[in-house]
Amino acid sequence: MTNTRKSHPLMKILNHSFIDLPTPPNISSWWNFGSLLGACLAVQIITGLFLAMHYTADTMTAFSSVTHICRDVNYGWIIRYMHANGASMFFTCLFIHVGRGLYYGSFTLTETWNIGIILLFSVMATAFMGYVLPWGQMSFWGATVITNLLSAIPYIGTNLVEWIWGGFSVDKATLTRFFAFHFILPFIISALVMVHLLFLHETGSNNPLGLKSNSDKIPFHPYYTIKDLLGLLLLLMLLMMLVLFHPDLLGDPDNYSPANPLNTPPHIKPEWYFLFAYAILRSIPNKLGGVLALATSILILAIIPMLQTTKQQSMVFRPLSQTLFWILVSDLFILTWIGGQPVEYPFIIIGQSASILYFSLILILMPTANLIENNMLKW
């Protein structure tokens, strides 16, 4: 008799994706973050759904509805803080996932990589719109400043901004549409995740050595299901520690004041996971130049497969490239720190230097290091 999981049309898909999937035997814990991202997405959708049951997308009541969730709804406070801090966990996993792809050369699987970039943009858009919903001071001014950047686009900029706002300023129409998009986007992201996995399973997963492992594979279950479960437990432990002990650690105190269009906060800044891009934006004195640099800082990931000049896929045996990779990671930490600082000396010059280094590393230094390593190995 045929096994149901191998014959049933639906079970067959799940079986080929998560149970009998041939997997390289040597993938390390850096490969855990894909499943952790799936778990983060599930947590965000579930908590978000419960929050949406009590939230009202209206400028007069949005702030008080969030307060009502925290004070009056049964366990509303934990749902709200799991959602807010879950976003931080999501981005932490996302950045590590992208970093792992860069380090081990997973960007050579171009379809998977490109869908991943679209996913990154979608998650960033969702998180930005979600930050606007509590309608606190930083929500309002963050929405005003970031959407206003589109006015730098020649000819159509101003019309585009007013079209997004639904008026001549950030108001009720903006909040309503941001809530609608924030609600629908996670489901679009879920569909994109399936496409991401579809392309990944077409080629098979990469591994730390960057070698073909077709001749030596093991089933995904039970080996990697157990391994992913351990990662999930650690992630949930970290999330719950954050939620229960330091729920406001990563938030902005200004967001506990209701939105006031007549009072600008002294330092307008986005959530921590956007600070690196915000620092790059601010490091260029010209508005259009800043917007282009901001977009390029993420879009640059799309041209990395074209800049690949090495004969080895992984960085494991390439010490020069490894050094540059960790300099890039350090540079991103510096940019994140600078993004949260006021625009004054010495932060301006540090931000500009870090931005130049960021683009130089990816566009010039790393491809050059690849060529040097090829030459040293006589390839």
Curated annotation (Swiss-Prot):
Binding site for heme b b562: H83, H182
PANTHER family, A to Z: CYTOCHROME B
Location in or out of the cell: Mitochondrion inner membrane
GO molecular function: metal ion binding; ubiquinol-cytochrome-c reductase activity
Gene label: MT-CYB
Binding site for heme b b566: H97, H196
Organism: Phaner furcifer (Fork-marked lemur)
UniProt cofactor(s): heme b
Record: residues binding a ubiquinone: H201
Record note on quaternary structure: The cytochrome bc1 complex contains 11 subunits: 3 respiratory subunits (MT-CYB, CYC1 and UQCRFS1), 2 core proteins (UQCRC1 and UQCRC2) and 6 low-molecular weight proteins (UQCRH/QCR6, UQCRB/QCR7, UQCRQ/QCR8, UQCR10/QCR9, UQCR11/QCR10 and a cleavage product of UQCRFS1). This cytochrome bc1 complex then forms a dimer.
CDD domains with a match to the protein in the record: cytochrome_b_C, Cytochrome_b_N
Remaining remarks: Heme 1 (or BL or b562) is low-potential and absorbs at about 562 nm, and heme 2 (or BH or b566) is high-potential and absorbs at about 566 nm.
Known role: Component of the ubiquinol-cytochrome c reductase complex (complex III or cytochrome b-c1 complex) that is part of the mitochondrial respiratory chain. The b-c1 complex mediates electron transfer from ubiquinol to cytochrome c. Contributes to the generation of a proton gradient across the mitochondrial membrane that is then used for ATP synthesis.
Principal place of residence: mitochondrion
The record's free-text note on cofactor binding: Binds 2 heme b groups non-covalently.
Similarity comment: Belongs to the cytochrome b family.
Keywords attached to this entry: Electron transport, Heme, Iron, Membrane, Metal-binding, Mitochondrion, Mitochondrion inner membrane, Respiratory chain, Transmembrane, Transmembrane helix, Transport, Ubiquinone
Ranges annotated as spanning the membrane: 33-53, 77-98, 113-133, 178-198, 226-246, 288-308, 320-340, 347-367
Annotated protein name in UniProt: Cytochrome b
A GO biological process held by the record: mitochondrial electron transport, ubiquinol to cytochrome c
Membrane topology according to the record: Multi-pass membrane protein
Any one of the GO CC terms: respiratory chain complex III
Domain of life: Eukaryota
